[in-house]
Amino acid sequence: ANFLIIEEPEAHIHNHIQKTLFDKLDYGDTQIIYSTHSTQISEVSNVENINILAKKLNYAEVYQPSTDLGAENINQVQRYLDAVRTNLLFAKGVILVEGDAEEILIPIIVKKVLGISLDELGISLINIRSTGFENVAQLFHNDRIQRKCAILTDLDDAICDTTENAGDSDALKKYKKKVAGSKQKGLERKTKLDAFEAGNTWVKAFYAKHTFEVDFISEGNAWEVERIIKKVYIDPATRTQAKTDIESADVAIYGKRVLTMAKQEGKGWFAIMLGKHISYKTEIPAYILDAILFAKETYSSNIVADIIQYRMNKHFEADNALDFTSCKAELLKYRNGTNKLEDLAFDFDLVLPDDQILTLIDKLK
């Protein structure tokens, strides 16, 4: 028997050549073994022949993504794993989304609010588009890849009363039917995902109550959406009405407006425009934060301290009258391992009692 062992060939080969070369690499009388971090090489590698090495404290585990999957399931995964999505094979945790808005905005929100990127956390955010969550999430299982996979999707709960009344116009009746239909699909989606994740501790779905755009405002982020009204509308009267709608406390009003804006611009472009106005003041929707904490369960004291330091710096830039003296002292102790997260949270709460970092700390305790 002949063996050919290649270690990290991507260090010496151009991206395009990697894909071409390893797609054609086949010797009938030779077993070829190669180690790689290349998404290009992973893309053209048969998923049945892939082994993932996971470094643990003082040992390594080996995962085989195709274990116990039927031929059709393997084929689905193989077709899906292109150069971008093979990132999930290398990630410490994975978040699956199905929309352009989530794919564009979530990394921006995390970076601007926490001062650290998803990449730094070891989390890959993958847009599955129309593939179907189950086709990808099936890779994460006790028998396959033992890494956490969070699914982010919409429950599409109704943003208005869908009861049809005698005086409703045809347009209003049509709108109510559409809202009711979306709600029904959302319930069906949840039922399906509940059954899929049952008994699998590596996969969990997290839901926006309505949709990403609506829940973004519900979380207290109307200001960010207001900033792009002038980009969406030209007519002064429409701009004024849109601002009034977005500032409304009624989800039926601001929900309909933000969805209208997103549809008019296209959700992807709408997200790009919105991304320019994300800041440390933007509130991370609760279901997204929960998904992040599921995808990556443990955080070193240095990462937590860096996030808190970032929040303090941003608040101090906005208001240099804030006194973080005690917080800084406790933060140093926390980095050195001489106090607990609870101690740090207590001092931070005295200075900024409403800061969202306290929610994160509470979830990490």
Model-derived features: positions:
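GG-anchored amphipathic helix commonly corresponding to the ABC/SMC/Rad50 NBD signature/C-loop
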Residues: 1-6, 15
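Loop/turn-to-beta-strand initiation segments
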Residues: 2-3, 27-33
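Catalytic acidic motif of RecA-like/P-loop NTPases
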Residues: 10-11, 39
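Conserved D-loop-proximal element of ABC-family nucleotide-binding domains
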Residues: 11-15, 19, 44
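Conserved hydrophobic alpha-helix in the ABC-type ATPase nucleotide-binding domain
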Residues: 20-21, 25
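Short, structured coil segments at secondary-structure junctions
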Residues: 28, 45-46
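H-loop/switch region of ABC-family ATPase nucleotide-binding domains
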Residues: 35-37
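Acidic, divalent-metal-binding catalytic cores of TOPRIM
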Residues: 42, 51, 55-365
